[in-house]
A protein has these predicted regions:
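Terminal amphipathic helices with adjacent charged low-complexity linkers/tails
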Residues: 61, 189-237, 251, 260-263, ...
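Flexible glycine/acidic-rich beta-alpha junction loops that bind and position SAM and/or redox cofactors
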Residues: 84-93, 141-143, 173-178, 203-207, ...
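Glycine-rich beta-alpha loop elements in corrinoid/cobalamin-binding modules
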Residues: 29, 37, 56-249, 256
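N-terminal pre-triad scaffold of radical SAM enzymes
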Residues: 25-30, 287-314, 347
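Conserved, mostly hydrophobic/aromatic
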Residues: 165, 271, 306, 331, ...
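Acidic, low-complexity intrinsically disordered tails
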Residues: 372-375, 591-642
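Conserved SAM/AdoMet-binding glycine-rich loop
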Residues: 24, 55, 59-60, 337-485, ...
């Protein structure tokens, strides 16, 4: 019989429990799978002997919905879920999404805006004397004063506004156990300065070696102060050399302790070897379950962390740059568990993490001294000390595909092709194409302008073209017809109209036709978001061009889909503005024909439209493929949560 964590009073009674130690409020539907953070935290606490219950997506208008499992003995836990609740609800154009893959039946509207704040207020109303701990991606990335794109304002730390006692940042397993032990031993408050990976409020600056960044009051009115604060926070996010950070809010301080140490391989194995049912809670059966599970139910998380340091990605600020991997045996055991499930069809959908082929530390130094301050490991140029060996990842994939009951093992999470090139490993590409590509391999060049890719922290155009050549050569040798599917992004800070035109010309020359494109979304806590808000690169203090006006962003977006008749006026306006009339005409180099703006809009109305964008939330392009690119639900938001 599958056993879920407690969700109802009847579950408590069946176990003979009069009360719970922790009640966890989640903005996501309850899915008991290791890709869903509430399940991981709940199971981890359970494994240490604590009694845990989950209230998933409670009615935030009714305080009684938060009381249904009774008063917790130790603490209330609150998370918005696997995504920031505002990103979950709104597109880059600030339009409401029609679906929510983390809710039953994919229905939108089951969580409030700024869910961490709303849930926290309700739990304080329900149990005022019970300690409140917040965590998850929303809390983690809003732990300092931050820019909020959806309100276009600088907001206070979510710790201040939620009135929580503690904020856990990062992945949370080690922190929650330390906090649980401190609560259980009645030494909660005195323990706070000594627990890594948490934030708390203090009336005074702690009497330890710490660094103070500009206050909330300063960053709210001064963009240079905002950039300085971000730089300090960015530089101290290493568990080996990072110092505690304080930021004044009014007459109190937000204190961030040093980051939690990376999990050992044994700890990683333990976290993923817990007795997850790998299913959504049966209470969702009548609505067809929870769509987000379909993407990950038969996938394996082999590691955490990413040393790619993409500027727009939250991983550095949440999981860190130091890779934490699982043992082959742990992954094989999980694969065997999946094989035994009735609905397993023989396909392991993915083996990876934030980046599929980052299976080990970037270099040996990281294990002792941490990731280098002020330097990146992989891009725009790989560090001379970067360990690019792919042997461990290849060995893992070989073991998995030999398991009885496995027909195919796919690699679908982000593959860093520049890392493959640094390894000069054509054999890896050929083996990947032979056994682990399902017709299309997704990669993320994001842009081709050197100026833009440098701002993004990505490899350049040349690396993408080299990998594309390797990929095509491998498939020719194998006699396979497989396609490279690149992600591209518009309107990233630093991207001018000229850069957008350069990308359009590249797409023309490479015969790529983007069916869906992604506008940059300034999510809290990222380097790119700091650049977007301030117009400053906080790492060097230099000004950065930012396309903020809707018309300017629309022109960059339209250039990526210049063949769409609906985009004609925007593309022509952009080309004239950039003095690129040479691209208007009938020649092979031209992007559009020279008809007047506003005419010809009825042309091709009878033709079936395919691959239209949906509010800027996704990005796919075809490379010479005549077929429609397939996209599963939930995939469009994965890269913001990895």
């Amino acid at each position: 019989m599958d056993t879920f964590l407690v969700t109802e009073r009847a579950d408590m009674e069946a176990r003979g429990w009069a009360e719970l130690d922790f009640v966890l409020i989640s903005g996501d539907a309850y899915v008991d799978h290791p890709s869903f953070a509430p399940a991981v935290i709940g199971r981890y606490l359970e494994s240490k002997g604590y009694r845990v219950g989950i209230i998933a997506q409670p009615d935030w208008n009714d305080v009684n919905a938060f009381k249904k499992l009774g008063k917790p003995r130790l603490a209330s836990l609150v998370t918005a879920g696997n995504l920031d609740s505002m990103l979950n609800k709104f597109t880059a154009a600030k339009k409401i999404r029609r679906e929510d893959d983390y809710s039953p039946g994919g229905e939108a509207g089951h969580r409030p805006d700024r869910a961490t704040l709303v849930y926290s207020n309700r739990m304080k109303e329900a149990f005022r004397d019970v300690p409140l701990i917040i965590g998850g991606i929303e809390a983690s990335l809003r732990r300092f004063g931050h820019y909020d794109y959806w309100s276009d304002t600088v907001r206070r730390s979510i710790l201040v506004d939620s009135k929580a006692d503690v904020l856990i940042y990062g992945m949370g397993e080690l922190q929650i156990i330390e906090l649980a032990e401190a609560l259980d031993q009645n030494r909660f408050e005195e323990s706070l300065p000594n627990i890594r990976g948490i934030c708390y409020m203090s009336k005074d600056i702690p009497s330890i070696d710490c660094v103070e960044c500009p206050s909330f009051e300063e960053i709210k009115v001064d963009k240079m102060a905002f950039a300085d604060a971000f730089r300090i926070q960015y530089d101290e996010q290493d568990p080996f050399y990072g110092r505690p950070i304080v930021q004044k809010h009014g007459d109190r301080y937000v204190v961030q302790n040093v980051p939690a140490l990376p999990l050992t391989q044994e700890q990683m194995d333990a976290a993923y070897d817990l007795p997850y049912t790998r299913k959504w809670h049966p209470s969702y059966d009548d609505k067809g379950g929870v769509p987000a599970l379909s993407e990950v139910q038969f996938s394996l998380v082999s590691q955490r962390g990413c040393f790619g340091s993409c500027s727009f990605c939250a991983i550095t600020n949440h999981q860190g740059r130091i890779i934490q991997n699982r043992s082959h045996q742990s992954l094989i055991d999980e694969a065997k568990l999946m094989i035994s499930m009735d609905d397993f069809k023989g396909y392991i959908h993915d083996v990876g993490g934030p980046t599929a082929n980052f299976r080990h530390l970037a270099c040996d130094k990281q294990a002792v001294f941490g990731a280098c301050k002020g330097r990146t490991c992989a891009a725009p140029e790989p560090c001379e000390n970067l360990n690019t060996n792919h042997d461990d990842y290849i060995a893992l994939l070989r073991k998995l595909r030999k398991l009885k009951g496995v027909k195919k093992v796919f690699v679908r999470s982000g593959l860093r092709y520049d890392y493959v090139l640094a390894d000069n490993n054509k054999a890896f590409v050929k083996e990947l194409c032979q056994y682990h590509v399902s017709g299309q391999l997704k990669v993320a060049p994001e842009h081709v302008s050197k100026r833009v890719t440098t701002m993004m922290g990505k490899a350049g155009k040349e690396e993408f073209l080299t990998f594309k050549k390797w990929f095509e050569e491998a498939n020719r040798e194998l006699g396979k017809k497989q396609f490279l599917v690149p992600y591209f992004m518009s309107s990233h800070p630093g991207c001018t109209l000229e850069d957008a035109i350069e990308l359009a010309e590249f797409l023309r020359d490479q015969h790529m036709y983007p069916e869906q494109v992604q506008d940059f979304i300034p999510t809290p806590g990222s380097l790119s978001t700091c650049m977007y808000y301030t117009g400053i690169n906080p790492l060097d203090g230099k000004p950065v061009y930012v396309a903020k006006k809707g018309r300017d962003k629309a022109k960059q977006r339209a250039l990526m889909q210049y063949k769409n008749i609906e985009n004609y006026d925007l593309v022509k306006e952009a080309l004239i503005e950039a003095n690129r009339r040479d691209l208007i005409g009938f020649g092979p180099e031209c992007l559009i024909p020279p008809r007047p703006i506003g005419q010809g809009k009825v042309q091709n109305q009878g033709r079936k439209k395919t691959g239209q964008s949906r509010g800027g939330q996704s990005r796919y392009a075809r490379s010479g493929s005549p077929s429609q690119v397939n996209k599963t639900k939930g995939e469009r938001k994965r890269r913001f949560t990895r």
